[in-house]
Amino acid sequence: MKIIVAITGASGSIYGIKLYEILKKLGHDVILLASKTGIKVAKYETGMEITPDFDEDDLFAPIASGSYPFDAMVIAPCSMKTLGAIANGFSYNLITRAADVTLKERRKLILLIRETPLNLVHVQNMLKIIQAGGIIMPASPAFYTKPKTIDDMVNFIIGKILDLLGITHNLYRRWGMREDD
């Protein structure tokens, strides 16, 4: 699959970084995008320097057009600013434009939200995304898996994203499986 992974300025950049790494490891063609704030937050939270494939202001990038073939887009984490822009058709940078293209071309768009608590405007914007064909996925790890580390909790969320993309993995123990499975 050809997948766009975008990292915005919300806390939780590890989700986008880890998703990108796992998709590459599994042999998928991945395009990495990041907002300027997303790059700063990733450095602050993880100590990692991320280098996007395109600048967030490059609206001449191939992925800004519906004629460019890709299968899906995941924004992880997705800030409420980015969610609001996408929900209201405001394509002010490459991330929001690529998301707009994803929706208009009826491709899979997954927005991993981490904000809490939510206000009415956030929820209304999520409803607009769902009505437009996108998927809202809260970064809410399960605890039946008995996570022992932050990595265990991150892997659960990444695994759920891979499930939505139809990609086979073994990142977390599924409900009903024994711990030694």
Curated annotation (Swiss-Prot):
It is an enzyme of class 2 (transferase). GO terms for molecular function: carboxy-lyase activity; flavin prenyltransferase activity. Transmembrane segments: none annotated. Keywords: Flavoprotein, FMN, Prenyltransferase, Transferase. InterPro entries: Flavin_trans-like (IPR036551), Flavoprotein (IPR003382), UbiX-like (IPR004507). It catalyses: dimethylallyl phosphate + FMNH2 = prenylated FMNH2 + phosphate. Pfam families: Flavoprotein. This is Flavin prenyltransferase UbiX. It comes from Pyrococcus horikoshii (strain ATCC 700860 / DSM 12428 / JCM 9974 / NBRC 100139 / OT-3). The lineage of its organism: Archaea, Methanobacteriati, Methanobacteriota, Thermococci, Thermococcales. The gene is ubiX.
